[in-house]
Design a protein with these regions (language model features):
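Active-site-proximal helix/loop microenvironment
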Residues: 266-283
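Small-residue-centered hinge/linker elements
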Residues: 2-270
Length: 283
């Protein structure tokens, strides 16, 4: 049995249905053309960029000087994603800048092995204070670079302890005449809230702990560090500081005890230099 024939549309309905089909086809055609046009444009831009990158790649000449200017603090792994790092850099948030330790060491090792690189210049102005263990790894890589026969030159307008540990490995160290080099030792500063919490706000804090060397909750029950906390902090800080002084003394061929004595008399040394921190650094 044949199905019943479909009812025929009236001419007006047929006109609008046909018009709709034409509009729908035109819309899809335009969208497809736009999509493929954008796709082709992106491909062209990528090809041009790759071509320019390949053509603009500089070929190292003999006796090349490589400038290494780390910006930020040394980390084992980035703490944020690439988008967040790009946004932070775009808004000028320099405190958020990080350098992966392995990237910096690889750059130093590549310079060591490249026969066309004659010297390396370290610009340390934007290197932020970093972990001592990481700084020692970089210092060891710089020592290997010098041992390979490459000249190492360090420059900075101002140097703190992190920057100077790396600069000390260089053949030559340059400091801005208006700059400074301060080695002040290690310290730890914590805030204590007992007076504010108990005396002013009336907050009672009940601390339960096992053992004397448990200082995590001390800020809530004391106004200053306990003798046990000071002893524990001094134990590890003295060890780190002695290692730091030893590294500096070996790199600069100095006596570690004499170096420590100069740091212990820092105010007197600055006064003897007339307040000129750069001249004091030369002493």
């Amino acid at each position: 049995m044949n199905p019943p024939p479909l009812p025929r549309r009236n001419p007006i309905a047929s006109f609008f249905v046909g018009l709709w089909d034409v509009m729908n086809f035109t819309r899809r055609l335009i969208l497809n053309l736009v999509f493929f046009g954008v796709l082709v444009l992106v491909l062209i831009v990528m090809m041009v960029a790759m071509g320019k990158g390949a053509s603009s790649a500089k070929i190292l000449q003999d006796r090349t000087t490589l400038v290494i200017a780390p910006e930020g603090r040394l980390v084992e792994q980035y703490s944020t994603d690439p988008v967040s790092r790009a946004l932070a850099k775009a808004v000028g948030d320099n405190n958020a800048e990080e350098i992966q330790l392995r990237d910096l060491i690889r750059a130093i090792e590549a310079a060591r092995d490249d026969k066309k690189i004659e010297r390396v210049v370290l610009e340390l102005d934007k290197l932020q204070p970093s972990g001592f263990a990481s700084m020692r790894e970089v210092a060891a890589a710089l020592q290997d670079l010098r041992a390979s026969g490459k000249q190492l030159v360090a420059f900075s307008e101002n140097m703190g302890q992190s920057q100077y540990l790396l600069a000390a490995q260089a053949d030559e160290v340059y400091l801005d005449p208006m700059g400074s080099l301060l080695l002040e030792g290690l310290g730890r500063y914590r805030q204590y809230f007992r007076s504010g919490l108990q005396d002013k706000l009336g907050v009672d804090v009940h601390l339960f702990k096992v053992g004397e060397y448990k200082s995590a909750a001390e800020p809530y029950v004391l106004d200053a560090a306990s003798p046990q906390a000071k002893e524990a902090d001094l134990f590890w800080m003295n060890d780190v500081w002695q290692r730091y002084l030893g590294d500096i003394a070996r790199a600069r061929k100095l006596d570690a005890a004499q170096l420590a004595a100069g740091i212990d008399t820092l105010p007197e040394g600055i006064a003897a230099a007339g307040g000129d921190l750069a001249r004091f650094a030369l002493q």
